[in-house]
């Protein structure tokens, strides 16, 4: 799928010249191009048009979570039919371990992870690993820290399609290898449940779950369901 802006506005003023100048510089291999403009001059909209013209995946970096969140919402509105993802640190609170010599006090490491942001991070990683080109990732400096080897992500991918010849037992083994946990009651992200010939998988990077229906050793149907 190609990038396609959804907006009632068109570039105006100095924006068309800026869009063309940036696109031309990037096509010619420039390492850096600077877009100048006062607050409210439409720099985000200008860059959205650059992305649409170049048709390349984009990484949008912000110096803090607040601005990253704002940019994510704006790019999401400009590209509602493309993969606009959000990737920032998932810590609500982080206390590193410490030692106070004067009082001989050891402070253990303590942290709190935001489940919603963790889900968005997984969604971003999934979009990048999917091979699609229409991906925009809005991130803070958190993206500088590695989250693992891409080959490990690929090796833990479970691919299914209607008509696939695979036993239900074999699929369950694949899900466990991909670090999903079986449950019958607490159906949440990263878990799966089995009900007869039906396997429901709650995705790690989405609010939806996948229902896989079997007929013998063949996948008969696939559908998205509400985990709740």
What are these regions (language model features)?
Residues 1-228:
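ASCE RecA-like P-loop NTPase motor cores
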């Amino acid at each position: 799928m190609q990038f396609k802006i959804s907006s009632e506005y068109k570039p105006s003023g100095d924006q068309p010249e800026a869009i063309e100048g940036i696109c031309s510089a990037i096509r010619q291999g420039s390492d850096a191009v600077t877009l100048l403009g006062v607050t409210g001059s439409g720099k985000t909209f200008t860059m959205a048009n650059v992305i649409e013209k170049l048709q390349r995946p984009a990484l949008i970096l912000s110096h803090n979570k607040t601005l990253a969140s704002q940019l994510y919402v704006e790019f999401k509105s400009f590209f509602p039919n493309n993969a606009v993802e959000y990737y920032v640190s998932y810590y609500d609170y982080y206390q590193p371990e410490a030692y106070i010599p004067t009082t001989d006090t050891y402070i253990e490491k303590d942290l709190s992870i935001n489940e919603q942001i963790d889900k968005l991070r997984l969604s971003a990683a999934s979009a990048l690993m999917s091979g699609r080109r229409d991906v925009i990732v809005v991130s803070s400096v958190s993206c500088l820290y590695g989250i693992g080897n891409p080959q490990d992500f690929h090796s833990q991918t479970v691919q299914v399609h209607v008509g696939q010849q695979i036993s239900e037992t074999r699929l369950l083994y694949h899900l466990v290898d991909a670090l999903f946990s079986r449950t019958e009651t607490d159906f949440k992200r990263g878990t799966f449940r089995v009900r007869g010939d039906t396997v429901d998988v709650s995705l790690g990077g989405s609010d939806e779950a996948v229902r896989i229906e079997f007929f013998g050793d063949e996948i008969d149907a696939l559908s998205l369901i509400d985990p709740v």
